[in-house]
């Protein structure tokens, strides 16, 4: 726990240097984590460098892949999708051992904050954030992809879309269970993805971030969105999340949805100061990694 709090503080400190509450929660619910835990933290050689027999070729939604050769806590590290249109896309991937392509699996994409971008070092996204690991406690039959992109703008958004399309084409994926999460700058990137291709996803969890993408496509696709952020987030503040929530809420009202129907699709979850300080965290923005351990937050995502 002490190590985790130190990591949270360091991530927040980096974000504050780089520029990278009263609780409001209009929807509870969600599934509880299952009981299987991750393995140790040691980086190991991947057996034969093999990731999946299906990850060798493709055309739109595909491309050639250079597979990683090391494993960290169940993730094959630093695979590279070579996309003709979007360049080299680095990512880590967790594929359950029992996956053989005969049954459809869920798919989860987790995008990191500034401290986890590729230029910070291979694997820094997994070393500094826990979303990719705690997700495994909720859904066992799920492939988890942790891209390491270069920024939080349009280029990274397009690369994320290309990578999602690749997995949808080359793996047996249950299209009704495709989940996205973005923390800080990763949330900005994923919001751009949502503004471009929301129909790729079932639900999106935006953590300690702001919305940079379009809204209308999200309302049209009915992709569920939850905004979770500290009331006094030191980088973004909570107001951008409130405004994004209100914009989507207004769009749904114009389409004639009832409040009950809107609540199924849209959640504004503002955490007060006590949420962080009671868990030993003084810096709300860096403390966003606590959301990875929050059953209500993560359970909501994987219940959709």
Regions found by a protein language model. Give the residues of each.
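Primarily recognizes the serine-hydrolase "nucleophile elbow" in alpha/beta-hydrolase
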Residues: 170, 176-220
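C-terminal catalytic histidine-bearing segment of alpha/beta-hydrolase fold enzymes
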Residues: 228, 232-236, 242, 253-304
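Gly/Ser-rich "nucleophile elbow"/oxyanion-hole loop immediately N-terminal to the catalytic nucleophile
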Residues: 98-103, 152-184
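Short, proline-enriched alpha-helix->beta-strand connector loops that line the catalytic pocket
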Residues: 140, 219-225
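Sec-dependent N-terminal signal peptides of Gram-positive bacterial secreted proteins and lipoproteins
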Residues: 2-24
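Solvent-exposed loop/turn segments at secondary-structure junctions
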Residues: 113-117, 149-154, 184-188, 209-213, ...
């Amino acid at each position: 726990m002490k190590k985790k709090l130190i990591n949270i503080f360091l991530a927040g400190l980096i974000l504050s240097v780089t520029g990278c509450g009263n609780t409001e929660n209009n929807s509870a619910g969600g599934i509880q984590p299952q009981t299987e835990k991750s393995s140790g933290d040691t980086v190991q050689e991947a057996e034969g460098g093999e990731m999946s027999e299906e990850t060798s070729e493709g055309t739109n939604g595909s491309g050639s892949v250079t597979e990683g050769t090391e494993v960290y806590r169940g993730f094959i590290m630093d695979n590279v999708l070579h996309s003709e249109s979007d360049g080299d896309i680095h990512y880590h991937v967790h594929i359950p051992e029992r996956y053989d392509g005969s049954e459809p699996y869920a798919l989860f994409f987790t995008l990191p904050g500034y401290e986890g971008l590729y230029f910070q070092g291979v694997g820094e996204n997994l070393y500094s954030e826990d979303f990719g690991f705690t997700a495994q406690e909720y859904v066992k039959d799920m492939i988890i992809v942790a891209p390491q992109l270069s920024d939080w703008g349009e280029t990274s958004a397009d690369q994320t879309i290309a990578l999602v399309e690749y997995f949808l084409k080359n793996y047996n994926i249950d299209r009704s269970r495709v989940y996205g999460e973005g923390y800080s700058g990763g949330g900005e990137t994923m919001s751009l993805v949502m503004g471009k291709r929301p129909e790729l996803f079932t639900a999106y969890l935006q953590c300690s971030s702001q919305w940079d993408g379009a809204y209308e496509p999200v309302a049209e696709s009915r992709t569920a969105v939850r905004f979770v952020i500290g009331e006094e987030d030191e980088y973004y503040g909570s107001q951008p999340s409130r405004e994004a929530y209100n914009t989507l809420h207004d769009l749904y009202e114009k389409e004639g949805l009832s409040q009950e129907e809107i609540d199924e699709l849209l959640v504004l979850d503002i955490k007060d100061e006590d949420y962080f300080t009671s868990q030993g965290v003084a810096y709300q923005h860096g403390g966003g990694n606590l959301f990875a351990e929050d059953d209500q937050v993560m359970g909501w995502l994987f219940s959709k």
